Design a protein with these regions (language model features):
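Conserved, mostly hydrophobic/aromatic
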Residues: 6, 18, 47, 60, ...
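Glycine/proline-rich, positively charged
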Residues: 27, 88-176, 180, 256
Length: 305
């Protein structure tokens, strides 16, 4: 496992962070703890609690108790709570503070290294909620405040200077919007976490062909002359690279971005976890970076057209 500095926090974070989400939490406390332990054995020291299931916090605390707390980096998603019909969005100060205190009580972690607001809209986060989070930080209950999302409100939140961390989608298909947002975060010395690094539209050759075929059909109707770039680029090579899966390529590409401290990985499958943790120590095959850039260029050209 490789490790990277995390913004201005002074923390050294593993290149991969295990997300403890609903899928693994539904399998019970013992299996959740076993997966966290497996991640620890692979050298992962970052863990993100994404689920509101109480058993998840219990399991994470149980598994992490074997290591010194200072060697670990544990974060919590905020902005969702349990309602009568399931999860509901809730960025009220009461909900945020309750989520933090419940997680700390169940996990016995002492403090959370990071709390992350999950994709808040521009008018969705009251000022008093931000004040409540700052009070938790002042009290030593949390260390860093972060914001995650892909909507345009992220730019407004970054401009406030109130946050230490940006969690953002970043993949082989990401464009200038994501890159500019990451650059703005770097200029503020923020830590950057990446997620959604394997876009759904790329997870099978059939999906890639469907999307790219639709684009070829659309642009063929716009132009009378043949497109000089037709047949060049495209992402089908992701599923034709020897000794690499498309998922592994996409993860490895995201980790080539120097601004990204860690990529979130979410799986309940121990075998898949074993596969993913091997990626940070691998180098992309020669020429693959150029293929990715050509595919990005072709996709960007089609969107601009």
């Amino acid at each position: 496992m490789r490790y990277r500095p995390f913004g201005r926090s002074g923390v050294v974070l593993s290149a991969l962070t295990l997300v403890v989400g609903d899928e693994i939490a539904r399998r019970g406390q013992d299996k959740t703890a076993a997966l966290v332990t497996q991640a620890l054995e692979h050298g992962i020291n970052g863990f993100h609690i994404k689920t509101a299931e109480p058993d998840a916090a219990l399991a994470v605390g149980q598994a992490l108790a074997v290591l010194e707390r200072r060697l670990l980096f544990v974060s919590l998603r905020l902005g969702f709570g349990r309602g009568r019909t399931g999860l509901v969005r809730d960025f009220s100060p009461e909900a945020l503070m309750q989520a933090v205190e419940q997680t700390l009580r169940l996990s016995n972690l002492g403090h959370l290294d990071l709390v992350i607001l999950d994709d808040p809209g521009e008018e969705e986060l009251p000022l008093r909620s931000l004040t409540a989070l700052k009070s938790l930080r002042s009290a030593g209950r949390v260390t860093l405040l972060g914001v995650a999302g892909h909507n345009d409100a992220m730019d407004a939140y970054l401009s406030t200077g109130a946050f230490d961390v940006l969690a953002t989608p970043y993949s082989v298909t990401s464009g200038w919007k994501e890159r500019n947002r990451m650059r703005a975060a770097v200029e503020q010395d923020m830590g950057i976490l990446a997620y959604d690094w394997f876009p759904e539209e790329l997870n099978s050759p059939q999906k890639i062909e469907k999307v790219e075929g639709q684009k070829r059909s659309f642009f063929g109707k716009l132009f009378k002359e043949p497109d000089p770039f037709e047949g060049i680029g495209g992402y089908s090579f992701l599923h034709r690279t020897s000794n690499w899966t498309a998922e592994d390529i996409c993860l490895a590409f995201t980790l080539t971005e120097p601004a990204v401290a860690s990529a979130w990985i979410e799986t309940a499958d121990p075998d898949r976890l074993d596969q993913l943790v091997a990626v940070p120590d691998r180098d992309l095959p020669p020429g693959l970076g150029a293929q990715i850039e050509m595919a990005r260029f072709t996709a960007g050209r089609q969107q601009a057209g």
